[in-house]
Amino acid sequence: MTPDERSVLIRQYADGPAVLRAALSRVPDQAMKWRPAPGKWSVHEIVCHCADSELNGAMRLRYLAVEPLPRIVAYDQDAWAREFDYHGLDPNLALSVLDAARRWTVPVLERMGEEQWRREGTHTERGRYTVEDWLRTFAEHVATHARQIDRTVAAWKARPSGETAKGSLVALGHRRTGE
């Protein structure tokens, strides 16, 4: 990855909270906790996931950039959503966490030297995992969820009138693991 390519991805990473807020501005209040299908996240849960993922990601970057061959541990994202009862948490606080973690991490990325960019560790699901892999993943992560929010709102608007949330996280039959 060239320094110019990195700069583009760092800017995309920095812009993530604004992208998420733009998607959230299109969500009716009544749609925030609606799930498009059993086992799928609501917009509210997506926002909380982004905060938890960002906290994990910020630490992963630091381990990768500094520690010798760190082990990067995946986590069961659905279990976090269920066990931490994301619907019971404040999505505005989650947005603040996301924003603060990114504002704290962007200068780290901007100041990293070439040696740090070449560092790597081992991800428990993906195997070899480099700082550049991390940047590619997290530069796109929030934008991916912003598109998911748009799809969820479209499904909410297209639902038969009077339909309530479909399913719960308790009924999840699959394991969605960590970026």
Question: Residue spans of the language-model regions?
Answer:
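Short, contiguous alpha-helical
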Residues: 31-79, 103-106, 114, 118-179
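Short coil/turn linker and secondary-structure boundary residues
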Residues: 1-4, 27, 41, 89, ...
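Amphipathic, non-membrane alpha-helical segments in soluble helical-bundle scaffolds
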Residues: 3-17, 40-47, 91-95, 132-135
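Alpha-helical bundle segments that constitute or directly flank the non-heme di-iron/ferroxidase center
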Residues: 2-29, 52-59, 63, 140-143
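Acidic/histidine-rich alpha-helical segments that form the ligand environment
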Residues: 12-23, 81-119, 138
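A short small-residue
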Residues: 1, 78-86, 125
